Amino acid sequence: MSERIIMDDAAIQRTVTRIAHEILEYNKGTDNLILLGIKTRGEYLANRIQDKIHQIEQQRIPTGTIDITYFRDDIEHMSSLTTKDAIDIDTDITDKVVIIIDDVLYTGRTVRASLDAILLNARPIKIGLAVLVDRGHRELPIRADFVGKNIPTSKEETVSVYLEEMDQRNAVIIK
């Protein structure tokens, strides 16, 4: 199986910086801004974007995580679900501008699950979506507001994102 490196470490760093600037422009600064990374790699990307925004604005914005495990539509819901546990952040996200962050946008089902988790717990003013890679093949009417790189793929190909925080390297690879 052949592999192609689509983004290396430097490209990922530049992309995270660009997305941070785009989010600041979209929100006209940092007021009421919240970042929520979808576990697991979205969490690391959210932290990187938070760090870039801090470098740019000298202000640290609230950042947390979304665990979509119990909101997926391809598994049965577990009765022990505590929906409040789906979002891990130290501030209320009601009446805030929430940016969901993930590594790859594919069918849209992960994003739909994250929207369910958010809206079950709060009522943000606005919700945006930032992804490192958009590979197409949507099954739901969902699109990202901030895209690092559009990578047209076939359904047979896989897009793998490697992040240093968990994979000891930074790369986006198509197999």
Curated annotation (Swiss-Prot):
HAMAP family assigned to the protein according to its UniProt record, in alphabetical order: PyrR
Keyword Transferase: yes
UniProt protein name: Bifunctional protein PyrR
Keywords, comma-separated and alphabetical: Glycosyltransferase, RNA-binding, Transcription, Transcription regulation, Transcription termination, Transferase
Subunit annotation: Homodimer and homohexamer; in equilibrium.
Record function comment: Regulates transcriptional attenuation of the pyrimidine nucleotide (pyr) operon by binding in a uridine-dependent manner to specific sites on pyr mRNA. This disrupts an antiterminator hairpin in the RNA and favors formation of a downstream transcription terminator, leading to a reduced expression of downstream genes.
Record InterPro entries: PRibTrfase_dom, PRTase-like, PyrR, PyrR_bifunctional
Highest taxon of the lineage: Bacteria
Catalytic activity: UMP + diphosphate = 5-phospho-alpha-D-ribose 1-diphosphate + uracil
Entry's Gene Ontology BP terms: DNA-templated transcription termination
One Pfam family from the record: Pribosyltran
Record motif PRPP-binding, residues: 98-110
SUPFAM superfamilies linked to this entry: PRTase-like
GO terms assigned for molecular function: RNA binding; uracil phosphoribosyltransferase activity
Gene name of the record: pyrR
Family as reported in the entry's similarity comment: Belongs to the purine/pyrimidine phosphoribosyltransferase family. PyrR subfamily.
UniProt entry tagged with the keyword Transcription regulation: yes
